[in-house]
From Swiss-Prot:
PANTHER family: RIBOSOME-BINDING FACTOR A, CHLOROPLASTIC-RELATED. One of several proteins that assist in the late maturation steps of the functional core of the 30S ribosomal subunit. Associates with free 30S ribosomal subunits (but not with 30S subunits that are part of 70S ribosomes or polysomes). Required for efficient processing of 16S rRNA. May interact with the 5'-terminal helix region of 16S rRNA. Keywords: Cytoplasm, Ribosome biogenesis. This is Ribosome-binding factor A.
Length: 138
């Protein structure tokens, strides 16, 4: 029977916390900006880790690419600091990827809000009372 909460999940969760602290306190590169670690996926053998990040201030594709490139350039430095912070025999090799789920979630939320607003406007523009509906059904 498989464990409900595996070691890789625990390591990924701890890595997410530690990398977030490192990005906040140690990385001074202005290209990174306001980076947030949204998730970490660790391979089963703990050799590789994919770190998903979002950038709060950067909206353009070029800014995002620059930020991810800067993080990838700093991966060795982050790896060494992570090794000092965590008690692992082998610290996973880090790769950084942009997580667009926050942007997609905001886009979907805006679409839903637009539909609700359009529906309210349509209902207020053409009031139909109950007697009109009954006449149409007959």
């Amino acid at each position: 029977m498989a464990k409900e909460y595996s070691r890789t999940q625990r390591v990924a969760q701890e890595m997410q916390k530690e990398i977030a602290i490192i990005l906040q306190r140690e990385i001074k590169d202005p290209r990174v900006g306001m980076a947030t670690v949204s998730g970490v996926e660790v391979s089963r053998d703990l050799a590789y880790a994919k770190v998903f990040v979002t950038f709060l201030n950067d909206n353009t594709l070029e800014q995002v690419k620059t930020g991810v490139r800067a993080l990838q350039d700093a991966a060795g430095f982050i790896h060494s600091l992570l090794g000092k912070a965590m008690r692992l025999r082998v610290v996973p090799e880090l790769t950084f990827a942009y997580d667009n789920s926050l942007v997609e979630g905001m886009r979907m939320s805006n679409l839903v809000s637009q539909v609700v607003q359009n529906d309210r406007l349509r209902r207020s523009a053409s009031p139909v009372d109950k007697t009109d509906r009954e006449d149409k059904e007959d």
